[in-house]
Amino acid sequence: MQQLNPSEISEIIKSRIAKLDTSTEARNEGTVVSVSDGIVRIHGLADVMFGEMIEFEGGIYGMALNLEQDSVGAVVLGDYLGLAEGQKVRCTGRILEVPTGPEMLGRVVDALGNPIDGKGPIEAKQTDAVEKVAPGVIWRREVNEPVQTGYKSIDAMVPIGRGQRELIIGDRQIGKTAVAVDAIINQKDSGIKCVYVAIGQKQSTIANVVRKLEEHGAMENTIIVAASASDPASMQFLAPFAGCTMGEYFRDRGEDALIVYDDLTKQAWAYRQISLLLRRPPGREAYPGDVFYLHSRLLERAAKVNEDYVEKFTNGEVKGKTGSLTALPIIETQGGDVSAFVPTNVISITDGQIFLETDLFNSGIRPAMNAGVSVSRVGGAAQTKIVKKLGGGIRLALAQYRELAAFAQFASDLDDSTREQLEHGQAVTELMKQKQYSPMSVAEMGVVLYAANEGYLKGMEVEKIGAFEAALLDYMNSEKKALMDKINEKGDYNGEIEAEIKESLDQFKATQTW
């Protein structure tokens, strides 16, 4: 047996000691005190920051929302059923981030950016913070480019510009989502990237939206962020912020994006649930005091930013380009009550609203937009020339019709001018009807609006107006394609184009093909 030299033994021990890793990792740990309804109370975590990600045992994450004297209130991001009292929790030193970039287009993800469409992982090259400060006043530009929804009634009377926030408000089941989805479908050739955020909806409804976007070739241009009714309140609360971050990726690089929040009422409900479980003091309708700030900080991130902002953000890589993020938030009212807390909040934050009415919907007028109450505060500057010039007469005709129709119910004999106005208003109301998934081009809108303004519908039976419009558009797209292409190119309207439209309408009316 070999004898070991004591000096050799000491050398081996010394070398082992020299190689020993004695570095220490400071970890701020706490202990779970209670778990209930997705809310966790934690003892410890003295250095945790507001909004910081915290990690539970088993790789589950949470977000610190209440920082109290001797405990922390956190919301669990995901399934909380595996958490138990006494488990360890640690700080991560990070705030919540989601993957962003063009790799997200065409995919359906949850509020944390994880794919849920079964198409495999997303190879996103970067992540961005979910909560961001909106661009300051100095970086913003005026809204001066249009977002065409494809609905003639909206584009003519309530125009939407790139960088605007336009609220879609109304009771349940009257076509709010239909308007927003059609607006997304209409962007498939416009270069505008789209984000659709589904909050608290049935999974079957979300699947139907995905299917319709795929059918119309718009899905490859769209990101869908889904927090369904079966997801925790924390995910429904975070989904709009995650979707906004994904849309901002394009805005900050000199591109245009459109985001639909469907709907913010359910986000407010989720936030109310979280706040009450965190024992925050309730205010009006049991909402917490900062529910206005919840929506204002989200919607202020939709903006049109100037060339300097884009150049600074991209470190000089993109020059001379403006970027925009246009928001279409949806709010669901109860019994048409727009004076409730959340609707009044969002109306005051946005740049206008499209008000959909149950009575109009039930009487067959779709989209069921009330033209008298609906308004766009900044979109007029962004309208195409032809729609702006010809759309003014439509709003006036509908306003006069609504006023006269109320009096006509009580009057037995009407003079000729009043009867003409009533008939014209009826014809225009019928003309403003439009089927879902059938968006119109600028040229098609221009021709239809010109026909309404210049008396081409006069004396026509209301039942035949739909057939007249369909036949007119078929004729214009086949026989007058050069004129339609010229209008679509720039949306201009001048004496020459007016004369060509008039000549085309006269020729069509002579054919009597409807």
Curated annotation (Swiss-Prot):
Keyword hit for Translocase: yes
Site residues by UniProt (Required for activity): S374
GO MF assignments: ADP binding; ATP binding; proton-transporting ATP synthase activity, rotational mechanism
Superkingdom of origin: Bacteria
Stored Gene3D superfamilies: 2.40.30.20, ATP synthase alpha/beta chain, C-terminal domain, P-loop containing nucleotide triphosphate hydrolases
A Pfam family assignment: ATP-synt_ab_C
Predominant subcellular localization, coarse grouping: membrane
Cell compartment(s), UniProt: Cell inner membrane
EC number of the protein: 7.1.2.2
GO annotations of cellular component type: plasma membrane; proton-transporting ATP synthase complex
InterPro entries: ATP_synth_asu-like_sf (IPR023366), ATP_synth_asu_C (IPR000793), ATP_synth_asu_C_sf (IPR038376), ATP_synth_F1_a_nt-bd_dom (IPR033732), ATP_synth_F1_asu (IPR005294), ATPase_F1/V1/A1_a/bsu_N (IPR004100), ATPase_F1/V1/A1_a/bsu_N_sf (IPR036121), ATPase_F1/V1/A1_a/bsu_nucl-bd (IPR000194)
UniProt xrefs under PANTHER family: ATP SYNTHASE SUBUNIT ALPHA, MITOCHONDRIAL (PTHR48082:SF2)
Family from the record: Belongs to the ATPase alpha/beta chains family.
Subunit description: F-type ATPases have 2 components, CF(1) - the catalytic core - and CF(0) - the membrane proton channel. CF(1) has five subunits: alpha(3), beta(3), gamma(1), delta(1), epsilon(1). CF(0) has three main subunits: a(1), b(2) and c(9-12). The alpha and beta chains form an alternating ring which encloses part of the gamma chain. CF(1) is attached to CF(0) by a central stalk formed by the gamma and epsilon chains, while a peripheral stalk is formed by the delta and b chains.
Name of the protein: ATP synthase subunit alpha
Phylogenetic lineage: Bacteria, Pseudomonadati, Pseudomonadota, Gammaproteobacteria, Oceanospirillales
Gene: atpA
